[in-house]
Amino acid sequence: MENQPKLNSSKEVIAFLAERFPHCFSAEGEARPLKIGIFQDLVERVGGEMNLSKTQLRSALRLYTSSWRYLYGVKPGATRVDLDGNPCGELEEQHVEHARKQLEEAKARVQAQRAEQQAKKREAAAAAGEKEDAPRRERKPRPVARRKEGAERKPRADKPTTKAPRAPREEKHTPVSDISVLTVGQSLKVKAGNNAMDATVLEITKDGVRVQLNSGMSLIVRAEHLVF
């Protein structure tokens, strides 16, 4: 028991539970509603394994059941399951309504954070513009050197009137090579031709990643079309 590796985070505990109880927990995609009282079942089944404490199990369950993909799975007609995937009764309406409110609040928090970040960017840009518009100190004109009598004036070389236009800087993006590193609520970009649109991860499925664009439209996108 002393030689067992220790799980240091709730995400690691969830990954362990998904491997230990694949018919109950899932590491990605839509999650199934859990049986009421499943915490006690976990304590009895995995108590002592991987040096897991009750506090770690409770924290991992709280993170799992508050994730967007779990809240999406709490819907009318869905059935709760135990650790072995056996049905344990249909969801009650009050539980479905509670999950819906939690999901709405989570989305509102993400939108508020995004709006706050945009406001800070605008403030920084405005501050930079004010510095550029500040009056510059007047420079005193340099004294003109007098030409000696009899000296010939050298013709000035013609300066090029136009400068070659600079090539526009291409914005570099990092492609998403593994969707398992993504988390619900994470901000990224969706490639559309030569452009990349801002988006937020709503759900990670086997077919791809469901994202929501700033326009409010949601769609499922494959990993090769996602970048950071």
From Swiss-Prot:
KW RNA-binding (keyword) present: yes
| Alphabetically ordered keywords of this record | Chaperone, Cytoplasm, RNA-binding
Gene Ontology CC terms, in alphabetical order:
cytosol
Region of interest (Disordered), ranges: 107-178
Asked if the record carries the keyword Methyltransferase, the reply is no
Superkingdom assignment: Bacteria
Compartments reported by the entry: Cytoplasm
The record's annotation in InterPro entries points to: ProQ, ProQ/FinO, ProQ/FinO_sf, ProQ_C
By its UniProt entry, which Gene3D superfamilies does this protein fall under?
ProQ/FinO domain
Amino acid composition bias (Basic and acidic residues), ranges on this chain = 117-136, 146-175
Q: Which GO terms describe its molecular function?
A: RNA strand annealing activity; RNA strand-exchange activity
Look up the record and give one Gene Ontology term from the biological process aspect. post-transcriptional regulation of gene expression
Q: Which family does it belong to?
A: Belongs to the ProQ family.
| Protein task | RNA chaperone with significant RNA binding, RNA strand exchange and RNA duplexing activities. May regulate ProP activity through an RNA-based, post-transcriptional mechanism.
Q: Which PANTHER family match?
A: RNA CHAPERONE PROQ
- Protein name (record): RNA chaperone ProQ
Give the originating organism. Salmonella typhimurium (strain LT2 / SGSC1412 / ATCC 700720)
State the encoding gene.
Answer: proQ
